[in-house]
Amino acid sequence: MKVSEYATEVINSRPYKYQTRQTFFKDLKRLGIWEMEVENINSALIRDVVEKIQTQSTRKRLFITARSIFKDLGICQDLPNLEAEGKIYDIPTQAELEWLIDKSKYRLQLLLCMFGGLRVGEACAVTPEKLSGDYLDVNQAYSQDGLHLGSPKTYGKILLPHWLAEEVRNMKPNQYWKIGRTTKLVSHSCYKLSRSAKFKDMTGGKTVNPHMLRHWYATDMIRRGVNPEVVRRQMRHKNVSVTLRIYTQVRSEEIEASLPTRLDEMKKPLETPVRALRLVK
């Protein structure tokens, strides 16, 4: 039996979410085993393909796919469970991000990512009916291809800034997302605007995607000293370690500031201020 036949049967018989099923199909094709016979699949074959991929998150996901699909056959179960990679983004300033969002046709969806921490599929599924006061019930998400409206990656009620809740409350019918409309439209709009000459001049060539806005949201709360448990709830993470490990944005200058300084270097900048104080005295 070919992997395509076996995998289709397995995936459709398990209670996977729509987006998870689509990801499994895509991953099996990326691994290059879609048309192979199941009896020829083994861990060494999967490793040879995955180890050529540079992105840690992609390697991790492909190993998960192989272990999941073939677990009933006992194949690929010795593939490693890689550590999640914490991303470090060089995110533009808040003013620059808001400038970009205001230029987008999908302004409301991007605002929900930046000031509500929503994933792009969740932002597309927002309607006024999901509001209770300024609390938003995140209970649905569109799949990336736009063909399915189902459950989000994580459920939860989050508190929106009042002005943003008002924007959601006043949504017009033409702002509602519809089945068949891919959420990539939001991502492409965001990326295209960040590649414009004006934005390049403003930021020095930084690019932006909707998930970076979600990172900004978490990072901004943590930098303002918001309790990590509150951040976790607003981000709808299953545990606070995910909040701190993966979604805390650390700028390059903060890393540099954390490095120890030699005593000889510390004395130099102190000489001038000390003399100045003595003169005043």
Short names for language-model regions:
Residues M1-D27, E51-T58:
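Short, aromatic/basic-rich helix-turn unit that serves as a nucleic-acid recognition element
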Residues D27-N81, G117-G121:
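N-terminal DNA-binding recognition helix of tyrosine site-specific recombinases/integrases
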Residues S43, D102, A125, G133, ...:
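Phosphate-coordinating loops and pocket residues in cytosolic domains that bind phosphorylated ligands
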Residues Q56, D78-V120, C124:
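Basic, Lys/Arg- and aromatic-enriched nucleic-acid-binding interface segment
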Residues I91-Q94, A125-V168:
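Conserved tyrosine-mediated DNA breakage-rejoining catalytic core shared by Y-recombinases
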Residues R107-L111, F115, G121-E122, M212-K238, ...:
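C-terminal catalytic core of tyrosine-transesterase DNA break-rejoin enzymes
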Residues S151-K157, H162-L164, N170, P260-K281:
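C-terminal secondary-structure termini that scaffold catalytic or DNA-interacting sites
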Residues L160-G205, Y217:
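Active-site/catalytic core of tyrosine-dependent DNA strand-transfer enzymes
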